[in-house]
Swiss-Prot record:
A motif (Twin CX3C motif) lies at residues 34-57. This is Mitochondrial import inner membrane translocase subunit TIM13. Mitochondrial intermembrane chaperone that participates in the import and insertion of some multi-pass transmembrane proteins into the mitochondrial inner membrane. Also required for the transfer of beta-barrel precursors from the TOM complex to the sorting and assembly machinery (SAM complex) of the outer membrane. Acts as a chaperone-like protein that protects the hydrophobic precursors from aggregation and guide them through the mitochondrial intermembrane space. Belongs to the small Tim family. Its main location: mitochondrion. Disulfide bonds join C34-C57, C38-C53. The twin CX3C motif contains 4 conserved Cys residues that form 2 disulfide bonds in the mitochondrial intermembrane space. However, during the transit of TIM13 from cytoplasm into mitochondrion, the Cys residues probably coordinate zinc, thereby preventing folding and allowing its transfer across mitochondrial outer membrane. Pfam families: zf-Tim10_DDP (PF02953). It is a peripheral membrane protein. One of its GO terms (molecular function) is metal ion binding. It is found in: Mitochondrion inner membrane.
Length: 82
């Protein structure tokens, strides 16, 4: 393996680890934000209203996350000249 291949492998591994951290962060924020908003009094199960609220909240949060991520990636590409 030459130095170019080693560098590419390291970059790929770092990107995968960063993606994993981002996914974990997203899940944690979804749980915190949506659960606090939609489930004021936790019980043994979610009511239909709580389930609907959680679904809606998660969809909105994911859409916002994707929008921010896309803008961030576009900016990185622009700055790197791609």
């Amino acid at each position: 393996m030459d130095s170019t291949q080693v560098k590419a492998a390291v970059i790929k591994q770092v990107q995968q680890e960063a993606n994993l951290v981002n996914a974990r962060t997203l899940i944690e924020k979804l749980q915190e934000t949506c659960f606090e908003k939609c489930v004021p009094k936790p019980g043994t199960s979610l009511s239909s209203g709580e389930t609907t609220c959680m679904t809606s909240c998660m969809e909105k949060y994911m859409a916002a996350w994707n929008m921010v991520n896309s803008a961030y990636i576009a900016r990185l590409r622009q700055e790197s000249g791609h």
